[in-house]
Amino acid sequence: MVSIKTRLSGIELDNPIIPASGTFAFGEEFKSLYDLNILGSISFKGTTVEERPGNALPRIAECPGGMLNSVGLQNPGVKKVVEEELPRLGKFFKKPLVANISGFSLEDFAVLSEEMDKVENVGILEVNISCPNVSHGGMAFGTDAKSVEAVCKVVKEKTKKPVYMKLSPNVTDITEMARAAESGGADGLSLINTVLGMRIDIKRRKPVLANKVGGYSGPGIFPIAVRAVYAVHQAVKLPLIGMGGISRAEDVLEMMMAGASAVEVGAENLVNPRVCEEIITELPILCERLGIEDIQDIIGII
């Protein structure tokens, strides 16, 4: 009997599949498609202190190998998320959640961490220091090692829950940021966030996104993500959530062999809303075919 169970900082997951923040909202749109309780967890919509309307339209554009997005962290703000969205989500999803938080100052991260620490069905805090959609805030933290460490320390002071820092690929050396997070007391890391990109409409002679640049995601960034996970796994002794272009069961095994203990599936949810269900069904079959009895045995074997 193949086991596809895995663990993140003492939390056991039935499988390593987690829909990524920003592509699954609060699960409401997906619950009619399949039983969401088959998922390992859900990383719900990125939350800020105050409500954010997001960036101007257009803010999503298809491109070869994936998509560009510049949504701009649209969300109702932490108060509404904690008081309305999470209780609603808890009615149909009975497992610990991954709370994705994003701040524009150390004070923001402190407030968000304190609020999420009170929520019983939040299992892990995923700290977004790398969002490329916002012109002020996230990138400044995620591209400077001292800032990464400082944010991590602030969050750790305000919560007893495991803290996973979400790293940006838009840096010279992602392992430097990983080590900084480890020094700050991180319990784990999530990587990678989207890769900065841009497309131009040659007829209109204007960028396709109103914000001009956005985050590139989808299968096109998968090799970049695998390399980053591998490098970070060699550099630090922390559990990793791997993400970036995952669209099939084979990708999950590849990412785990590189060093991830679990994975997040992002852009593919927008292409195929049942992709997570399909991967969970296929994963044990693929493991059996490859002679893998316990999926945790392959973590970081490369």
Question: Where do the language-model regions lie?
Answer:
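N-terminal capping/small domains of soluble enzymes
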Residues: 1-97, 102-104, 279
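Hydrophobic faces of well-ordered beta-strands that scaffold small-molecule active sites
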Residues: 17-20, 40-44, 97-101, 125-127, ...
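Alpha/beta enzyme core
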Residues: 32, 83, 106-241, 250-258, ...
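Phosphate-coordinating loops and pocket residues in cytosolic domains that bind phosphorylated ligands
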Residues: 35, 257, 300
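Short gly/pro/ser/thr-enriched loop/turn and capping motifs at secondary-structure boundaries
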Residues: 48-53, 132-134, 196-199, 270-272
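C-terminal helical cap(s) of enzyme catalytic domains, especially alpha/beta-barrels
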Residues: 55-64, 200-214, 256, 268-293
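Short donor-sugar binding/catalytic loops of nucleotide-sugar-dependent glycosyltransferases
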Residues: 246
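A short, charged, Gly/Pro-tolerant segment at domain boundaries
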Residues: 296-302
